[in-house]
Structures are given as C-alpha cells and as structure tokens.
Swiss-Prot record:
Protein name (database record): Holliday junction branch migration complex subunit RuvB
Region (Large ATPase domain (RuvB-L)): 1-183
Chain positions covered by the region annotation Head domain (RuvB-H): 257-348
Binding site for ATP: 22-23, 64, 67-69, 130-132, 173, 183, 220
Main localization (coarse): cytoplasm
A GO term for molecular function: ATP binding
Gene3D superfamilies cross-referenced by the UniProt entry: 1.10.8.60, P-loop containing nucleotide triphosphate hydrolases, Winged helix-like DNA-binding domain superfamily/Winged helix DNA-binding domain
Swiss-Prot/TrEMBL catalytic activity: ATP + H2O = ADP + phosphate + H(+)
Localisation: Cytoplasm
PANTHER family (UniProt xref): HOLLIDAY JUNCTION BRANCH MIGRATION COMPLEX SUBUNIT RUVB, PTHR42848
Lineage of the species this protein comes from: Bacteria, Pseudomonadati, Pseudomonadota, Alphaproteobacteria, Hyphomicrobiales
InterPro entries, per database record: AAA+_ATPase, AAA_lid_4, DNA_helicase_Holl-junc_RuvB, P-loop_NTPase, RuvB-like_N, RuvB_C, WH-like_DNA-bd_sf, WH_DNA-bd_sf
Residue sites binding Mg(2+) per the record: 68
Gene: ruvB
Length: 348
C-alpha cells in the first residue's frame, strides 16, 4: 500500500492544485533567486528587442523551487505561446515530433524531468535544438527514407532535479543553464505574506516567520503549509494568522520547529536508538523503516543532510551531535563523529 503523502514533501501532490493561484505571474513578482532573475531579465529583454527566440534554458535544482513557474513566466514575458510536457510522457520520437511541429515562431516548449527522456527521443531533439530541423526515418527496411522537416525557431526550457543524469550532448545544447537554490527564511516570509494576501487572510510578521521557518527552504512547501494553517485560522474565526495560530496548526500537522515531520524524526530516532547513532548502511535503514532505498536517498535524507543532522560516510549513515540535540537525546559517550567520513566516498 502506498504511504500517505507527506506534508513537507517537495514533490507535487494532488492537493497542490490551490498552489496555482499563489504563483507569481511576472519576474517582478517572483521572490528569491536574485541572480537567476536578474540574468533571465536581461536575456529575455535582449531576445525581445531583437525579435528572436530566446536561447534554450535549463533549470536545475531540487523540486518545489519554482522551475515550472519560471518557465511559464519566461513565455509570458516574451509574449509567446507556452507548451508543457515531461520527459516520461514523451515515449517515442513521434511524440516529440508532434509537439515540435505544432510550435509557432519563438514559442516556449517546457519539458519537466528532462533527464528522463529516452535515448531515441534525445537523438531527435539534438538537431531540433541546434538547427531547428527534424530528422525522421519514414518506413522500415529497404523502403525506409530520411525526411528533414523545418521547424519554427522555438525556445526549449528544460527542468531537472538530477543534472548528473543528463547526457553531455543534451546539456551542452542549453545556452542558458540556471541553478536554483533553496530559499532563505526571509525570502519565504515574503512568499507566505504574498500568498496570504492572494488567499484573502490576514498575516502578521511573526506568523509568516513561523510558517517560513518550517517550510524547508521550499516555496511549494510554504504554500502548502499556508493553506493548511489558513484552515485552522478559519475554523478558529481568526481574521489573521499570528505565531500562536501557525505554531498550533503546524504542531497538529506534526511539522516541528525545524521543519521535520514524523518520518524524519522516525528516521533519526531509529539510527539513534537501534544503532547507537551509526554508522549504519542505507540498506539496513531501508529494511528497518520498510521504505525503498530510493525513497530514503532522494526524499528523506537530503533535507536532514542540508540541516546538518546526518552525514553520509564510507561506513554508513551517521547522526551528528545536532541530531541528538534535536531529538532531546544524549549522544553516546564513546562516539567520535569527527573521525568518521573524512576520507573515501559515500557508502553504497
């Protein structure tokens, strides 16, 4: 049975449909990613003045940081059409050809999870990006022939959470690579405050700070927490969300002051109580938690590592002193974390 979706998951959830109303519509409304915004603004303005298609753009970064939103803003700022799809959806070369041949001049085609394109589809994409041509094989066997189709000059905007899985030929064809970083608490406060205004609920500065601190540096999570806190405020007939309401709501949702949820705390406490703080292998943790290895490595661990609660060492996963302090546990006296993980690669 599939586990319930986590409140603090950066991945898109089915209940995130309300997230659309909170999204900024222009670069000037987009909070955070200052350098990325500044560069994009220049590139867009230059392309607009020349009347040319913007060079191909690649957004790289963890989920929930605004890659899709920025792609939509790019098309809106350019005043052109926007088509969106994702890597897994484009199963064969014909699917990609259908998308590309329907694009108008200077349109934006957005491909999310572009690292999941099949090699066969990538081969068709290369000449389309570079020469704005499609090279297709029509027919089979001796009757097969190559056909070239001219395309409108378009902008491909790709998004990926795993840049290392992109092939070099594909990566090199993006003239504008942009890396998105986690947001600061101050930036998330601005996002929460704007979101509250859009949703028509009052928000005090300390209420916005409380939500922002627990949003794990991710706007998608901040918006999700805001919508749930608004429910608590509405049920209490409160005209505004303050720190007390936000704290009560988020505590009821099991999101603690550091943004950790029940799964995070279970992971940390399992290592602390069952394995003396580690090191312990990821396969052992997968068995102990009844979770697949991929879920542990891609969903649970990144934020714990980012916050300094966990180390990946050659000998396994190791809790830091910070983790024991957060759990309210005493650190084992015979442990010396500073001597572990200084050399070698992460464990398999």
């Amino acid at each position: 049975m599939k586990p319930p979706a986590r409140m603090v998951s950066p991945e898109r959830r089915s209940d995130d449909v309300g997230d659309t109303a909170l999204r900024p519509q222009q670069l000037s409304e987009f909070v955070g990613q200052q350098q990325a915004r500044a560069n994009l603004s220049i590139f867009i303005e230059a392309a607009r003045k020349r009347g040319e298609a913007l060079d191909h753009v690649l957004f790289v970064g963890p989920p929930g940081l605004g890659k899709t939103t920025l792609a939509q803003i790019v098309a809106r700022e350019l005043g052109v059409g926007f088509r969106a799809t994702s890597g897994p959806v484009i199963a064969k070369a014909g699917d990609l050809a259908a998308l590309l041949t329907n694009l108008e001049e200077r349109d934006v085609l957005f491909i999310d999870e572009i690292h999941r394109l099949s090699p066969a589809v990538e081969e068709v994409l290369y000449p389309a990006m570079e020469d704005f041509q499609l090279d297709l094989i029509i027919g089979e066997g001796p009757a097969a022939r190559s056909v070239k189709i001219d395309l409108s000059k378009f902008t491909l905007v790709g998004a990926t959470t795993r840049a290392g899985l992109l092939t070099n030929p594909l990566r090199d064809r993006f003239g504008i690579p942009i890396r998105l970083n986690f947001y600061t608490v101050e930036e998330l406060e601005g996002i929460v405050t704007r979101g509250a205004r859009v949703l028509g609920i009052g928000m005090t500065p300390d209420g916005a700070n409380e939500i922002a601190r627990r949003a794990r540096g991710t706007p998608r999570i901040a918006g999700r927490l805001l919508r749930r806190v608004r429910d608590f405020a509405s049920a209490a007939d409160a005209s505004a969300i303050d720190r007390a309401i936000a704290d009560h709501a988020l505590s009821a949702l099991e999101v603690d002051a550091a943004g950790l949820d029940a799964m995070d705390r279970r992971y940390l406490s399992t290592i602390a109580l069952n394995y003396g703080g580690g090191p312990v292998g990821v396969e052992t943790m997968a068995a102990a938690l009844s979770e697949p290895r991929d879920a542990i490595e891609d969903i649970i661990e990144p934020y714990l590592i980012q916050c300094g609660y966990l180390q990946r060492t050659p000998r396994g996963r190791l809790l830091t002193s910070h983790a024991f302090k957060h759990l309210g546990m005493a650190e084992p006296a015979n442990r010396d974390p500073s001597q572990i993980g200084l050399f070698g690669n992460d464990d398999d």
